[in-house]
Amino acid sequence: MSIDLRPVSRPMKRCCVFVAALCAAALFSQQSYAQRSGASDRLNENTLTVVSSSPNGTYMPIAYDMSAVLDDGDNLRILVVLGKGGGQNIKDVRFLKGVDLGIAASNTLGYYRRTGELGNIDDKIVYIAKLYNEEIHFIARPEITSIEQLRGKKVNFNFVNSGTQLSARDVFDRLGIKVEETNYGTADAFERMKTGEIAASVLAAGKPAPAISAVKAADGFHFLPVPLSKVLINDYLPTTLTHEDYPGLLAPGQTSETIAAGVALIAYNWPKNTDRYRRIAKFVDAFFPRLAEFQKTPRHPKWREANLAAVLPGWKRFEGAEEWLRTRSQVSQVSPAERGQFDQFMAAKQMQPAALPQSERDRLFQEFLQWTKARERR
């Protein structure tokens, strides 16, 4: 067979160059698309949303603190969503597809459990951690000196489906005091209180609440004392507002009794083998070991009340959070002999515990426990 060695024509050369250029462009495009696709997948896999509150509430600064401390580029990102507060936040976590986490008060969870308004939420909503106690502020006009005097008068319960609305309804119902409910934002309610249209306003928010810090005694308003009574004791805690909390409304040394409810970080109860579960578990692994960072300036002072081991009675904790706490408990109870064995275990893996993140050390300790159990069975 003979081989044709005739020179290639100039048009054919141009055609070959063009085809080669197309192939190179296609390859570059595929590589570029793969890189963009990988970055997009990584960003989506490691981003969580947390629904908070309006700027007047405490939930929003608490959620923004999570974002400020935990954001780690594409590895973990916290998107803060403005919300209406506890009641609506529970609905959003329960039903909205794009919401991973929410901040809500325990008494609003109890409200939905009692009413069945959201169906059976016992197996749908889990809590990750109790964060702090949320004070319920009762602010009244000067002629109102007791909560009983609000009977039959207009009282603002904040926005519809807010945590304040549900808390205020619950408290007045339990006390047997029937009032006329209004649903304005706190600032609007204060303006209507000045004209006498509204007698009082309620706000459930961790102290010091910005919307109330702006109020002065010169405006004619004052805190209405609401001590803890027998009808409230199962779902509320006694607390005190002080001059240090609200210098504009309370004189030095002056205090006002009120009630509070526990606030928790909640999530939907995703099955363990789902991506949404994995995402929340990753958040827990980042959040729990760094709680001490949240309890320092400039973070919200309410973080100083947080205790990861605190329970929310009657509610199930997210399994990934429960596992983390169980592991930490086991680590804290390690004997000196076991600590030496663990060090040997780490040395065998050529690892230095101090150089690893806490979540990785905890994972390795679990592996160590399994290793020791396997040795004991031999």
Model-predicted segments: where are they?
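Bacterial N-terminal signal peptides
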Residues: 16-27
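N-terminal (or domain-start) structured segment
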Residues: 35-103
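Bilobed "Venus flytrap"/periplasmic-binding protein-like clamshell domains
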Residues: 45-70, 78, 134-191, 195
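Pocket-flanking alpha-helical
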Residues: 67-68, 79-120, 188-192, 208-216
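Pocket-lining segment of extracytoplasmic ligand-binding domains
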Residues: 106-107, 116, 177-275
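Ligand-binding clefts/hinges and TM-proximal coupling segments of bilobed small-molecule sensing domains
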Residues: 160-171, 238-313
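An extracytoplasmic/periplasmic, membrane-proximal ligand-sensing/linker region
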Residues: 188, 205-219, 223, 269, ...
